[in-house]
Amino acid sequence: MSFTAMLFSCSNNTQEVRDFLASKNLPIGIAKNALHVYKDSGRISSKLITPLLHDFSNRKQHPYNEFPMGVKIINFEGKDSVTITGNYAISYSKTSVSEISGNVVVLNHTEQSKLETERLFWDQNTQYFFSEKAFTLSTVKDTVYGIGFECKEDLSMHLAKKTVGNLITSEK
């Protein structure tokens, strides 16, 4: 009877591994069917749901998270509940700007308004959306079509560019 033991040791430190993965443009982490809950002062402020997350936080200059199979974000900030969905997203950590593309839909459940576009940029610091792509903004009263827009996260205070459609307005 013979017995053989082989022992191996790794001497890489965590930073060396991170640098290696970054140099090969590989994520430091991959999560499948991820649910991330964000809390502020013990209160849930938003949820992020995605079938696949690539974590590139190992990048020194521009760390980011990529959602190649789409993303659903439910935001409970303020008085309105807003849901954002898209087929692809990338979120940059340092700037807090996200790009969401492919069948992007933003729903304000409280006001019953909906924004649809193919590409949307979201500045999470200023809580602002903007795009230069074609869009449809539907409210209870009217629907506006156009190319290019800016608006707050809750779809209020919007600036629509190159628009067509009927708008109901009131003087104040």
Which residues fall in each region the model found?
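Mature-chain termini and adjacent capping regions
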Residues: 1-172
